[in-house]
Regions:
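Active-site lining segments that contact anionic ligands and/or coordinate catalytic metals
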Residues: 9, 64-69, 92-96, 113-118
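Active-site "cap" helix and flanking loop/linker of ATP-utilizing ligase/carboxylase catalytic domains
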Residues: 1-2, 18-78
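Glycine-rich active-site loop/lid that clamps phosphate-bearing ligands
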Residues: 72-102
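Internal nucleotide-binding/catalytic subdomain
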Residues: 1-10
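Short coil/turn motifs at secondary-structure junctions
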Residues: 9, 22-24, 124
């Protein structure tokens, strides 16, 4: 896979090139289905006989629950307040929070911190998952020393079914 960044006047810059199967999403497969991709890859090298057993015990039509990874990007400013981001990290729906910056650090375009934060969230239904996602989109906040919002506002898109 390849990851790029684009900036007006600078064009496309390559950030990362890697032979990988998943980014952060492989952890979702484990969280939602109980199927560990890392274990599968290791079995492919060290215990080939285990692979059939792993697939036999797995049913893609019956997830343990619904899950998502909610990503947040930010403006290139110094972070002064992350209170809300840490409050969201403690939400009962969060299986794993990942806040990439520390207070006082400046958000950069690319590098070791690709996002402001991401949260692995889980729920018992798709509707509840959408509700939780909407709550995170509404509540997520990091501000700069002037109190200005750094977090780009995410929104759940509307999908319209058209009849032809």
């Amino acid at each position: 896979s390849m990851q790029f960044f684009w900036k007006p006047g600078k064009g496309i810059q390559v950030c990362e090139i890697a032979a990988r199967f998943f980014g952060y999403e492989h952890e979702l497969t484990d969280m939602v289905y109980g199927f560990n991709i890392e274990e599968l890859l290791l079995a492919g090298v060290y215990q080939k006989e285990k692979i059939s057993e792993m697939f036999a015990g797995h049913d893609v039509f019956h997830p343990l629950h619904h899950g998502a990874v909610v990503y947040f990007h930010g403006k290139l400013r110094k972070i002064a307040d992350q209170t809300k981001a840490y409050e969201l990290a403690g939400n009962e729906a969060v299986a794993k929070p990942w806040i990439f910056y520390k207070t006082g650090e400046a958000v950069v375009e690319y590098g070791p911190n690709p996002y402001l934060a991401l949260y692995y969230i889980g729920a018992e239904s798709r509707e509840k998952l959408d509700e939780i996602t909407g709550y995170f989109f509404d509540e997520m906040s990091m501000t700069d020393p002037d109190g200005q919002e750094i977090t780009y506002r995410n929104q759940i898109p509307d999908y319209f079914i058209t009849e032809e």
